Structures are given as C-alpha cells and as structure tokens.
C-alpha cells in the first residue's frame, strides 16, 4: 500500500501542533556526610521541615535540621549503600501513612508497610503523620466509660473515652499486661484498638500478637511495631503513625483505643537523633523540646463533639521508671500532660498483688464523670478503705493489742486486696465487678476466710451467670444500681451453697 506524501506531511503537522514542551524541575542536593542514620545534605534550599527526602538508593529520609548551608536528615531505613557525594532529591511530600479499615488485623511498621507476611495492605487513603491536635471548641467533655475489665482500674481509677491515662511503673511490673487486657475487653465494646510497640524485642511483639490472635482481639486491632533492631527514626515516628491511623477512625465517628508501649524508648530514640543532629542537650541529655515531643502526640487523643461525629481516641501511654522514680524528667513530663496515671509498684507485684496498682498514687482526673452509676455507688468508699487499711497494716505490725474496730478494718482490708487481685488475660465484665464489690463493701465477705475469697468470686460469677442473669443485664443495660433487696437475696442465696474450706 502506497503512502501519499500529503498524508505524511499532515501527520507531521498534527504532531508538531500537539507537541508540548515540558521541563521537570527537581530540587536536588548532595550528601556531604553520612553516618549513624543521619545525613547532612547540601543544596536543598527550599526543603520543608518534616519533608520526605529521596536518596539514590530509593531509601527515604526525614528533613529535621534546616540550616543556612545544609539540611540534617534522619534516614528511615538501611543506609549502608548511601555514600558522600550521592545525589538526593526533594519529594515535596510531608510524611504520610496508609490508613483505613484494611489495616485492621495487620501488623505494620511505622511507615505502614506490612511485616506480618500476609501480603500488601490494599488501601489508597493516607494521612500525614504530624497533624495539629483537635481544637478546644471541636471537643466535648469525657462522659462515656471505657471499661478495661480490670476491677482495680474500673473501680478506683476509671477511664473515659477520649481520656489520656498514663500507665507507669518499673520494668516487669505488668504494664503491658494491663494494656493488653484492656484491648481484650473491647471485644463487644465497638472499639477499634491500635497497639504501638516501640523498641521492644521482636519475640515480645510476636507473643503479644499471638495472644491477641488467640483471643480473637486481632479482628479489631492494628499493631504498629518499631522493634529494638529498627533505626532510631522508626522508633521516633512510630507513635505518630499510630495516632494518624487512629484519627481516620475518630473522624469517621468511631471510638479508638491506642496504646503506646512505651514512650520512654521513644524519648531515648529522639534523644539519640537530637544529639547526632548536634542539637544542644538539656536535663538528662534530652533536647529542650522533649516535652513538646509527647504533648503534641497525646493532645491528639480527644472526644469530638457531636457535630464532628462524636468519635474519640483514648490513649494509654506507658512509661518505664527506674527504681520507682516518678520524679525523673520524662515521667514528670508525661504525668503533667495526661489526665491521670495508674502507678504499678514492684513491691506489690512481687508480694503477689497483681495487677500491682498502688491506689494511693494512682488517679483519674476526668474518668470519674464517665464511670457508670452502679460502680460509682458501690466503689465510692473503696479507695479510702484501701488507704486506711495500708496505714493500719503498717501500724499493726508493731502491736498485737488491737481494738475491735481496728481488727475489723484490717480483716475487711485483707479481703479488699484479695478481691482486687486478678489473673492476666481474664478481663471481667463491669456487671460482675459491681456484684462482687457490692458483696465486699456490704460485709458479705467478712465471714469468708481470706484464702477462699478468690474461689468465692469465681463461683459467684458462675452462679450469677445462670441464676442472676436479669440482675446482671439490668446493670449492663441501664448502668444503674438495682435495689439492695435484689442484690441481697442473690448473694445470700449463693452463700447458702458456698462451702468454706476447712481451717
């Protein structure tokens, strides 16, 4: 087939007419210095703070120090292939992470990349890691309870949806157990949970993930893990990635529980980065903005007003102390930011009181207004009773001649301590908590031997499940305390069938 000259010229003419001259201008720089996960870059004059920088090897970095002649960048990945003189370029993007329902049930790193071997996360939605916290007028007061399933917390230091409650204590005092049990208790609470593991051993994270999977809690949980083997920048951004994922659900009107385990390791990672970036050190060698590091994170937990959907983020940050020193720099910072703290004491833990909650030093500043009426009524005097028992206990060690009133208080105190003990991974519904605490405060346990208290509680819960379902359902649905007669008849009837152990 012959091609006519006119056709060729017409084709060329149309191509020339449609040709658009495009020039892609990319801001590039050069690596001046590299080492310890930090790169000094020359030439990126217009870079933004917190912008992602792309290296020749494809690894991304985060712009931190913006100076006149160079930029300090923390590298988010392996940096063995990055050399002095390498070309780097701006991306024009602030760091973002993938968000959405597709992440539920997955284990991801702080960049949102899956690390559980179950294929890619198929979500197109992203959110910036750093975001301004919700404003004052967009919030509402905390008025809904978040039940942890742990008697000592729900009775003494109640937590409300949208609250920030610190869990603080020495290593090996059960801080993570309290957080995991709280996640397990959200199974029927319509709450999405996010567990952020910061600087933990991979084996520990794996064990926690398996526990969540066995209990069916992974069906409503996202795990964000920056392990001890990851570079310091990953530990630094992990909590911000977790809360960005949580905000997606909060602004969709859902309730979210987020656990930061633990912020001490994040502060240490930030200190490491700051010292490598030559920022001036302050108290305990932390940089001057270590307070802002945690305040801008924890302020993102909120209870939104009804106009914005009424969603919430409840934060449970964990802080590890050294030898019970809660007056150290980072612990005091986080205590001042949060709405209360649960203080776990190693002395109590090793004496068999678990969870090892020190009721005297634990407080919830806003959760009381969210506590259900039934619990507020039965547990109203519990904290004072426990405090006076601790005082009398130390006093009673020095003398055996105790008056009848003191002896009764001591006996009641022993039973209170026993009731507040709880096995790990066995959260208790709030209605069952109300039942046993009512029995305690009204004196129904005074004639039960201390060694039988745990068995009494277990058998009472089993008995109530089949014989007092209406009573339990009334507490569960209304939150109010049923009439005393209903409680009294139920507990009295059960006590007839309970057999005390032989002395």
Curated annotation (Swiss-Prot):
E.C. code: 7.1.2.2
Region (Disordered): 114-135
Stored SUPFAM superfamilies: C-terminal domain of alpha and beta subunits of F1 ATP synthase, N-terminal domain of alpha and beta subunits of F1 ATP synthase, P-loop containing nucleoside triphosphate hydrolases
Residues given in the record as ATP binding sites: 169-176
Coiled-coil features, chain-numbered ranges: none
Key words, A-Z: ATP synthesis, ATP-binding, Cell membrane, CF(1), Hydrogen ion transport, Ion transport, Membrane, Nucleotide-binding, Translocase, Transport
Domain of life: Bacteria
One Pfam family here: ATP-synt_ab
Cellular location(s): Cell membrane
GO-annotated cellular components: plasma membrane; proton-transporting ATP synthase complex
Site location (Required for activity): 362
The reaction(s) this protein catalyses: ATP + H2O + 4 H(+)(in) = ADP + phosphate + 5 H(+)(out)
Topology with respect to the bilayer: Peripheral membrane protein
Any GO MF annotation of the entry: proton-transporting ATP synthase activity, rotational mechanism
Disulfide bonds: none
Chain segments annotated as transmembrane: none
Similarity annotation: Belongs to the ATPase alpha/beta chains family.
Quaternary data: F-type ATPases have 2 components, CF(1) - the catalytic core - and CF(0) - the membrane proton channel. CF(1) has five subunits: alpha(3), beta(3), gamma(1), delta(1), epsilon(1). CF(0) has three main subunits: a(1), b(2) and c(9-12). The alpha and beta chains form an alternating ring which encloses part of the gamma chain. CF(1) is attached to CF(0) by a central stalk formed by the gamma and epsilon chains, while a peripheral stalk is formed by the delta and b chains.
Protein role: Produces ATP from ADP in the presence of a proton gradient across the membrane. The alpha chain is a regulatory subunit.
Name of the featured protein: ATP synthase subunit alpha
Biological source species: Staphylococcus saprophyticus subsp. saprophyticus (strain ATCC 15305 / DSM 20229 / NCIMB 8711 / NCTC 7292 / S-41)
Record lineage: Bacteria, Bacillati, Bacillota, Bacilli, Bacillales
Protein's gene: atpA
